[in-house]
Regions:
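Boundary at the C-terminal end of the N-terminal hydrophobic targeting segment
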Residues: 4-12
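Polysaccharide-binding surfaces and accessory modules of carbohydrate-active proteins
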Residues: 13-18, 23-26, 33-244, 260-262
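Short, structured beta-strand/loop micro-motifs enriched in basic residues and often containing a Trp
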Residues: 248-260
Length: 274
């Protein structure tokens, strides 16, 4: 008797390397799979070994860090994208298609576009990362394209999702009111969610400022030492910054338009840029 077996092998991962002079943002993906978020922090000159990284978490429990989590599949956390499809379907599962990277006319600036599509519906999403080398700044936004036969309703459409791994997270942000602007608030994040948000349209900075600092691996704020990540929304309007620490101590930061009363009907053939 002959017994034959075949081992299931994962598709080869493609590294998406976005970098400035001193920092790296690294993703990995294979066609038809979710885009995994591997690293944001100090620059990694050779990211190739990260292609084989596995978290050894159970995939059924939604514990892999993904680049742009959508409402659907096994995502149980706050989604970056939540839509109602033309046929009423609420499920969205984004899968990698391709990516391109090019240097813009200013050679200090590199633009990387990562293309995704829903596993079942004709809905496309592009993540656009623009890296400014000397300034050590990476901007990101999403472009949503409707190829379905009817309108798609957008409920949540954040500009970015950033998973971070550290032992502690100290959040610093500014708030205020008339005659007492720019008050400083420090919050040590615990498991669960915290949001900084505004629905005051163009008057957002009168109360909550759409920017933040995150001190990693420390519960005290210092202006002279430590690892700090800064983020800001580069536009005025209703916004929400959502900070969610999960059971594995991973912090996911969502930044973008406030989902409150923000539904948008995207007609067939139209695109929406966050």
């Amino acid at each position: 008797a002959l017994t034959a077996g075949a081992a299931e092998t994962a598709a080869p991962q493609r590294i998406i390397d976005i970098r400035t002079d001193d920092i790296s943002l690294i993703l990995s993906a294979a066609p038809g799979e979710e885009i995994r978020f591997l690293h944001f922090g100090g620059r990694i000159d050779d990211p190739a070994p990260l292609a084989g990284y596995r978290s050894y978490r159970h995939p059924d429990h939604n514990t892999e860090d993904v680049a742009y989590p959508a409402f659907g599949g096994r995502n149980y956390h706050e989604p970056a994208l939540r839509v109602t499809h033309a046929d009423g379907d609420l499920n969205t599962e984004l899968r990698y298609v391709s990516h391109t990277s090019k240097q813009l006319s200013d050679k200090n600036v590199t633009e990387t576009v990562v293309k995704m599509t829903d596993c079942c519906q004709a809905l496309d999403v592009e993540l656009v990362f623009t890296a400014y080398a000397r300034e050590n700044v990476i901007t990101t936004h999403a472009v949503i394209r409707n190829r379905e036969k009817g309108p798609v309703t957008l409920h949540s459409f954040y500009s970015s999702s950033l998973p971070l791994k550290a032992d502690k997270y100290l959040l610093t942000h500014l708030y205020g009111a008339w005659a007492r602007e720019a008050q400083v608030d420090h919050t040590l994040l615990t498991h669960g969610s915290k949001s900084i948000a505004s629905t005051r349209e163009v008057r957002t900075t009168h109360t909550e400022n759409p920017a933040f600092l995150l001190t990693l691996n420390s519960d005290s704020f210092s202006e002279t030492y430590g690892e700090v990540i800064a983020g800001a929304l580069a536009w005025s309007g209703n916004f929400r910054l959502n900070f969610e620490v999960d059971e594995f101590d991973v912090l996911t930061v969502l930044a973008g338009a406030n989902p409150n009363a923000s539904e948008y009907r995207l007609r067939p053939g139209e695109t929406f840029t966050t």
